[in-house]
């Protein structure tokens, strides 16, 4: 039995400040929730080993500051991502409206090989609160218009749908990682023009 190499999946969580990105990550990785809000400065990450379809993978989940002054974290931060998670607060409509700009920001910075099919997952967080202002159908319609992005309604506080959402994130990230590996195994052929071919045949003929 051949041993499979370890797979590291890079997942980036984006969204406005205060939507619960850190809380979702902590709930998923550490099964903990804190009511004390502490803004993330720059970026931080946690890792978790998970089974995806009988394969053990390590997820490296990057949490980002939502403040605009941290929005340009640099190309190196985004590059190599296998999945991008977009988070909004269902009680704050403005955080939903900015999903477009977060998605665009990621695609510009990460410049994935196949942007049309790059895996995103959207989380509508804080469904445990009563003053909901973003309807489920509205969020689903946005996701459908963006190549049918998977959508989950979550509560980091009550641990609602967090595990299920990250299972989908891991599965989609693994699929993306596998496709990139296959693509890299078959480099693009180098095309020679007529002059190059003539030059090559002349150099190989030592008569």
UniProtKB/Swiss-Prot annotation:
Deubiquitination at Lys-191 and Lys-194 by USP32. Phosphorylated at Ser-72 by LRRK1; phosphorylation is dependent on protein kinase C (PKC) activation of LRRK1. It comes from the Eukaryota. A lipid is attached at residues 205, 207 (S-geranylgeranyl cysteine). Its main location: membrane. InterPro entries: P-loop_NTPase (IPR027417), Small_GTP-bd (IPR005225), Small_GTPase (IPR001806). A motif (Switch 1) lies at residues 28-41. The keyword Ubl conjugation applies. SUPFAM superfamilies: P-loop containing nucleoside triphosphate hydrolases. The modification Phosphoserine is found at residue 72. Pfam families: Ras (PF00071). The modification Cysteine methyl ester is found at residue 207. Mg(2+) binds at residues 22, 40, 63. It is an enzyme of class 3 (hydrolase). Belongs to the small GTPase superfamily. Rab family. The small GTPases Rab are key regulators of intracellular membrane trafficking, from the formation of transport vesicles to their fusion with membranes. Rabs cycle between an inactive GDP-bound form and an active GTP-bound form that is able to recruit to membranes different sets of downstream effectors directly responsible for vesicle formation, movement, tethering and fusion. In its active state, RAB7A binds to a variety of effector proteins playing a key role in the regulation of endo-lysosomal trafficking. Switch I, switch II and the interswitch regions are characteristic of Rab GTPases and mediate the interactions with Rab downstream effectors. The switch regions undergo conformational changes upon nucleotide binding which drive interaction with specific sets of effector proteins, with most effectors only binding to GTP-bound Rab. This is Ras-related protein Rab-7a. It comes from Pongo abelii (Sumatran orangutan).
